[in-house]
Amino acid sequence: AANAVELQRALGPAVYSERLRHHFETFITEDDFRRIAAIGFNSVRIPVPWHVFGAQEDAIANIPAIDYVDRAIEWAEKYKLSVLLSLATVPGGQGDSNESPTTPESTADWHSSKNGRHVALTTLEKLAARYGSAASLLGIELLDSPVVSVRKNIFTMTDGIPAHYLR
């Protein structure tokens, strides 16, 4: 499977959800944050999906990941690390980490639909509200690796996304 949608279709919602939960519990631990700080790094980048606060559509059986982000923020503060949160996926996909099923004709079209823009901005607003005052927050990346060559309707972007980000 090339992405979360295809993986869920292959495994089924129950198995997919259990594997995702196991991944969240074991992939990154407090010990990783301790070791990162111990070797002298001062920051971590945490990719978050558009559904970090829980499922927002029926297409994919998502479990909320926000508790794991909360935990990572706490660990970062404990080990004096800065955190860059990165919106890593959006409905419709934005490029290499496309959430949509992959086909030779598939394109990143999150910005072409009002819903895609709304979901992206709503998720960013919720992240800012939740972590904006966190001592460890370095920033929030608006979108991870958007592919320039597939942008459509670029001038219909929702207010709030700076024009320089679209260059």
Where are these regions (language model features)?
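Non-catalytic accessory regions flanking glycosidase/transglycosidase catalytic cores in CAZymes
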Residues: 1-42, 82, 122, 129-133
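Active-site region of glycoside hydrolase catalytic domains
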Residues: 93-167
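Aromatic- and acidic-residue-enriched carbohydrate-binding clefts of CAZyme catalytic domains
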Residues: 1-19, 58-65, 93-114
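Aromatic-lined substrate-binding rim segments of carbohydrate-active enzymes
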Residues: 22-92, 162-167
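Glutamate identity and glutamate-enriched acidic tracts
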Residues: 6, 18, 25, 30, ...
